[in-house]
Amino acid sequence: MKRGKTRKTDEMFSNYIRTRDEWECLACAKSKDYSNNRQGLHCSHYWSRSRENTRFDTQNCISLCTYHHLYGWGHGDGRNEYTAFMIKRLGQEGFDKLDVRAHLTKKQDDKLDKIAINELMKEVQ
């Protein structure tokens, strides 16, 4: 899987997603507190970060532990589980709309993305 270059806004958005999801892996629903172990909990993008239009889309991202992000849901049959989870979370119509957004093009705009992410963080603080 091709990974997009990490930017400062990626770090900000990742922190927002993990805070929104209360620092828990949504796949295994463990109540383990990852707030002191940021490396153990990842911001997983259903559609890759290389797709600029959904890179900072809150419906495209969830918190996953290292296992589910790198081994469980990211590969083979696990991808089917990830898809089923996303459809359940967003509904079929919401998932289909996310799919459409993922296939549109968007020019990178870090300044605008940073403003939008700061506004999102206000909602969870």
PLM segments and residue spans:
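Arg/Lys-rich, low-complexity, intrinsically disordered N-terminal tails that contact nucleic acids
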Residues: 1-12, 123-125
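Short cysteine-rich loop/turn motifs with clustered Cys
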Residues: 8-42, 65-68
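Short beta-strand-alpha-helix junction that forms the catalytic/metal-binding core
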Residues: 25, 51-72
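Short, well-ordered turn and helix-capping elements at secondary-structure junctions
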Residues: 32, 47-50
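Short Cys/His-rich "knuckle" micro-motifs
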Residues: 35-46, 73-79
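Substrate-binding/catalytic groove segments of enzymes
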Residues: 71-81, 91-98
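Short flanking/linker segments adjacent to small metal-binding domains or redox-active Cys/His motifs
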Residues: 95-125
